[in-house]
């Protein structure tokens, strides 16, 4: 007889593009994914630019911090989702083709439906 393992959902919201906020979001997202949680990484307009190809790499080699691309890849490998609020595209002058391949551009209302039932929320 097999027991069903309960899957928990963790929501990480990032509305800033500074190193402290972004790295905190990535670290918590990777930690939650490593514990088996389904992770939703939601970036609001203030944090939108970090999902553009080449931006996360700028946070590499920060003293005492892990490699942001390692964290990003870890979350992705463990089925984490990367969601950008659609308002971030025009607000920050981003071209959709410049976003990382894994990024979904969604309305905030769609994200809220996806986040339903989450047991943990973190905002940076």
Residue ranges of model-derived segments:
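Short, glycine-rich nucleotide/cofactor-binding loops
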Residues: 10-23, 55-56
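Short internal beta-strands
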Residues: 39-44, 82-86
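Short beta-alpha junction loops
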Residues: 45-48, 89
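N-terminal beta-loop-helix "entrance" segment that forms/cooperates
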Residues: 47-62
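Short, flexible loop segments at the rims of nucleotide/cofactor-binding pockets, characterized by
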Residues: 58-63, 98-102
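A glycine-rich helix N-cap at a beta->alpha junction
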Residues: 59-86
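A short aromatic-anchored loop/beta-hairpin motif
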Residues: 74-78, 83, 92-99, 104-113, ...
